A protein has these predicted regions:
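WD40-repeat beta-propeller superdomains and closely related acidic/aromatic-rich repeat-like regions
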Residues: 1-237
């Protein structure tokens, strides 16, 4: 919103910047990995990649016509990234994975990120793990032995309260308090545990909308079990 641009990314590994007044991209960056998820607030633009890698851009450098990641590093989660969502203040991001985990990563100074060169590129060193960074499990059925683990399909931050929601392949939506590292609310209003595929808040932060449908987490055969339907509108206080 600050820059009046459109960002796109795809499995070809290309991230494009479009000025809506022109037909083609004005800037482009080619990753070696597929792009799975992207999120941008203010100057912070974060890209979730295949092979569990994360790319961080500083969009303030666009004024100097520089469009390349400040950092490419290995995610602190062990399995495929499903969703990236930048904090409303642009000072960090949440990352969800197919393993039913969410990681919270704070960016203390976007203009002074640690640069540690390795054979595989640039990575964040251990000393960059701040005290406010953490990860937690979610979207799991612990009544089973072993527990059933579901993907985190989407993450959305409330623009007013700073809390955030997750939705998953288990058909559950949860609301979390990042500062106190606790779950505030959890509910499943969807019949037959149809996966929830995406979610978002309105600008006032009092409505949470989510979409539902099969997310292919159980392969093609399981798609026959799910039927499309309408979700009720939900009010979040």
């Amino acid at each position: 919103q600050n820059y009046n641009i459109l960002l796109t990314g795809g499995w070809d590994g290309v991230v494009n910047i479009f000025d809506l007044r022109s037909s083609g991209p004005v800037c482009q960056y080619q990753f070696e990995n597929k792009v799975y998820s992207m999120s941008c607030v203010k100057d912070l633009f974060v890209v979730g990649l295949s092979e569990i890698k994360i790319g961080i851009f500083n969009l303030s450098k666009l004024q100097n016509k520089i469009f390349k990641p400040e950092l490419i590093f290995n995610s602190h989660l062990k399995y495929q990234t499903r969703k990236i969502c930048v904090f409303p203040d642009g000072k960090g991001f949440a990352e969800g994975s197919i393993e039913g985990r969410v990681a919270i990563k704070n960016i203390r100074d976007l203009n002074n990120l640690p640069q540690i060169n390795t054979e595989n590129g640039t990575t964040i060193g251990k000393d960059d793990q701040g005290k406010d960074d953490f990860a937690f499990r979610c979207h799991r059925n612990t009544k089973n032995n072993p527990p059933l683990v579901y993907a985190v399909n989407d993450i959305a931050f409330n623009p007013i309260y700073g809390t955030f929601s997750t939705v998953g392949s288990d058909g559950i939506y949860s609301i979390w308090d990042k500062l106190n590292r606790s779950r505030l609310f959890e509910r499943n209003d969807v019949q037959d545990k149809t996966p929830l595929t995406s979610c978002d808040y309105n600008s006032n932060g009092n409505l949470l909308a989510f979409s539902m449908g099969y997310d292919w987490s159980r392969g093609a055969e399981a798609a026959k079990e799910y039927n499309a339907g309408l979700a009720d509108r939900k009010s979040v206080v």
